[in-house]
Amino acid sequence: MATTISELVDKIARLENQLVEELKKQQEEFHYTVEDNKIKFEQIILDTHRKLKVAILPWLKSATLRNVISSPSIYPMVIPIAFMDLTVTIYQNVCFRLYGISLVKRSNYVVMDRHNLGYLNGIEKFNCLYCGYGNGVIAYTREIIARTEQYRCPIKHARRVVGTHRRYANFVAFGDAEGYQTKRLEFRESLKDTD
């Protein structure tokens, strides 16, 4: 069974690499490059984007009532998200250094670049910043907690868990006391060289 899980994890890694290659093709298709984290479009694409942008007033007129009504309850969520961002950053900088765990690089997870798209108006850009930040912080937090789980309790649950993190598949099986005792320190050691 461990071999099957290992094979599946390897297959997922291969598929992730394949996804990266497909995204590179997409960059070529839409004529942009990313250099030093800066996005550069060809001029003809920038001109096309500007022509396709819907100005704020017509955009607001076409908005549905439910979207307008829900806005005041969406944006305040940035407060607990920012608080989580701050606290998990402090947590990992204190605890991970004490445990010898490699720090999670926040910039790999919190990516806010869609505001560079010329076909988005100001409100759409703001929405994209909000979602990029929120989802980025959640992914960043998840990786920090996943490393914590690997350090403290690398055991799978007895029940099926939906949406497990990428480290979970390698944890020891529920009930495998011997495996836990023999692999616990190995799991901790592997966190020192994690990127």
Model-derived regions: residue spans:
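Short, charge-rich amphipathic segments
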Residues: K11-Q26, I56-P72, S102-V104
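Cys/His-clustered metal-coordination modules, chiefly Zn-binding fingers
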Residues: N108-D195
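A transmembrane-helix-recognition feature enriched in membrane-embedded lipid enzymes
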Residues: T64-S102
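Compositionally biased, charge-rich terminal segments
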Residues: V34-P76
